[in-house]
UniProtKB/Swiss-Prot annotation:
Lineage: Bacteria, Bacillati, Cyanobacteriota, Cyanophyceae, Acaryochloridales
Protein name: CTP synthase
Region (Amidoligase domain): 1-267
One annotated Gene Ontology cellular component of this protein: cytosol
Residues the entry annotates as binding ATP: 14-19, 71
Catalytic reactions on record: UTP + L-glutamine + ATP + H2O = CTP + L-glutamate + ADP + phosphate + 2 H(+); L-glutamine + H2O = L-glutamate + NH4(+); UTP + NH4(+) + ATP = CTP + ADP + phosphate + 2 H(+)
A Pfam entry, by short name: CTP_synth_N
Example GO biological process: 'de novo' CTP biosynthetic process
Length: 543
């Protein structure tokens, strides 16, 4: 029977519940247990697809086209297991489902209430993951902080869930803060005690405490928390700050987290194999060749807006024994401040995705600089569209060329709306989303990097290259090296006269893994190393 681990958070938000959940997933998988991780988000949006990156960070897209919380990216990267739309649940989606059932008459005229209808729907979503994926363990992260009014239906649902499924099949893990107070020179347990008290008032007694702290727990703290929170001392697990999130599974393994989880769930204790993960962390900390990469975007004030891009770069840097340094460049300020000043001496330039006209001219200027200066360049989604506009204006001779998204009256709409998007009014969940096949041109840079002729990548866009300009681009030196299998949609463009210039309509960052860096990011950093007269082992990773 499937076991369930619920992860709640207390005291403050952004305490690291997602990393703890993902790390536990890695520890269980290292013991040959199958795992799926579910995120329950308390906001009323149906999904984060229409939310501002400044508020929410990046939107992570799954193979089946779900627009989800960025934590699902952590889940995939740590467990190397694809997530789906079943792994992301919001208050909005719960209420939407319940209201739809009420409109259909499913409740037979009954009064629809938070208990039992909302809580039953939450429990059904949890069970659906277990039924669909049949994992040994489902880890469920509850978004928000205990005490938030938005989280109450989820907490009530998981309280009921433990009673219905059975205590030996369910475990409650609470991630909390144990702060160091400099003026007192002491660690304080009171915030954790109050957080657990709040949780217990709802009817949930945590089985394990994960104690977030900026330093090792001082002697006596574990015993004090054990006494006041009614948790066995061996289940009070310190989680001090780490230099990298990829070190967290190893730290939690040393503290015995997985052992306690298996004990409490009556699962067999198995020997873990974390050798590859240990080697990954050693390579990360052993990297000694610095390489600076510029990320040119309009959401750079919040680095989480480009989280998967940064992680994909980091995966490749680890494989290439490079110390990755990110130079954040605000595309809104780029033209005014000067492109050369902002991008001088960078090893590579990445222009990631986005929506809307704001900051686009800065992205185009950065792409022109990369092309003219021979700096390795990778464009992603909107980054490819901006590369098309840049080429159209400066090489193909199409004055005022633009995307129809930014200028509906442009004389040269080199980027236009996908035909199937013409009559769509709603914004949420209506783009070209999810995993699609792409056919690569023989002998192209893309084929050389991937080592395959047909690839599969995740998409999130409404606009595409306008095929009316395809021949002109080919005649002026661009190459179209990736298309949809029917040849209709342009997915990859290259400039072969450049050391490394490639742009793609999809989001390769979502499929990069710590132990399997994505070929495009690996190729970018390898080209940057070559440009810097550094040795690099090979063009594609060998994992």
């Amino acid at each position: 029977m499937t076991k369930y681990v619920f992860v709640t958070g207390g005291v403050v938000s952004s305490i690291g519940k997602g990393i703890v959940a993902a790390s536990l997933g890695r520890l269980l998988k290292s013991r040959q247990y199958s795992v799926s991780i579910l995120k329950l988000d308390p906001y009323i949006n149906v999904d984060p697809g229409t939310m501002s990156p400044f508020q929410h960070g990046e939107v992570f897209v799954t193979d089946d086209g779900a627009e989800t919380d960025l934590d699902l990216g952590h889940y995939e990267r740590f467990t190397d297991t694809p997530m789906s739309r079943l792994n992301s649940v919001t208050t909005g989606s719960i209420y939407q489902a319940v209201i739809n059932k009420e409109r259909r008459g499913d409740y037979m005229g009954g009064t629809v209430q938070v208990i039992p209808h909302i809580t039953n729907e939450i429990k059904e979503r949890i069970l659906r993951v277990a039924k669909d994926k049949n994992p040994d363990v489902v880890i469920i992260e509850i978004g928000g902080t205990v005490g938030d009014i938005e989280s109450l239906p989820f907490l009530e649902a998981i309280r009921q869930f433990r009673t219905e499924v059975g205590r030996h099949h369910v475990l409650f893990m609470h991630v909390t803060l144990v702060p160091w107070i400099p003026s007192a020179g002491e660690m304080k347990t009171k915030p954790t005690q109050h957080s657990v008290k709040e949780l217990r008032s709802i009817g949930i007694q945590p089985d394990i405490l994960i104690c977030r702290c900026d330093r090792p727990l001082v002697p006596g703290i574990k015993e004090k928390l054990s006494q006041f929170c009614d948790v066995p001392v061996e289940c009070v697990i310190p989680s001090p700050d780490a230099k990298s999130i990829y070190e967290v599974p190893l730290l939690l393994e040393r503290e015995g987290l997985a052992t306690q989880v298996l004990n409490l769930l009556n699962l067999e204790q198995r020997q873990p194999d974390l050798s590859q993960w240990q080697a990954l962390v050693e390579r990360l900390y052993g990297s000694h060749r610095p390489l600076e990469v510029a990320i040119v975007g309009k959401y750079v004030r919040l680095s989480d807006a480009y989280l998967s891009v940064v992680e994909a770069l980091r995966h490749s840097a680890i494989a290439l024994d490079q110390e990755l340094r990110i130079r954040w460049v605000n595309s809104e300020e780029l033209v005014e401040n000067g492109v050369e000043t902002a991008l001088s001496n960078v090893g590579a330039i990445v222009v990631p995705g986005g929506f809307g006209i704001r900051g686009v001219e800065g992205k185009i200027a950065a792409i022109q600089y990369a092309r003219e200066q021979g700096i390795p360049f990778l464009g992603l989604c909107l980054g490819m569209q901006c590369a098309v506009i840049e080429w159209a204006r400066h090489i193909a001779g199409l004055e005022n060329a633009n995307s129809a998204e930014f200028d509906a009256n442009t004389p040269h709409p080199v980027i236009h709306l996908l035909p199937e998007q013409q009559d769509i009014v709603d914004l949420g969940g209506t783009m070209r989303l999810g995993l699609y096949a792409c056919r690569l041109a023989p002998h192209s840079l893309a084929e050389k990097l991937y080592g395959e002729t047909v690839i599969y990548e995740r998409h999130r866009h409404r606009y595409e290259f306008n095929n009316a300009y395809r021949n002109l681009f080919l005649e002026t030196g661009y190459q179209i090296t990736g298309t949809s299998p029917d040849g209709r949609l342009v997915e990859i463009i290259e400039y072969p006269a450049h050391p490394f210039f490639i742009a793609v309509q999809f989001h390769p960052e979502f499929r990069s893994r710590p132990n399997a860096p994505h070929p495009l990011f690996y190729g970018l950093l390898a080209a940057a190393a070559k440009n810097s007269n550094r040795d690099h082992p090979q063009l594609v990773p060998s994992f």
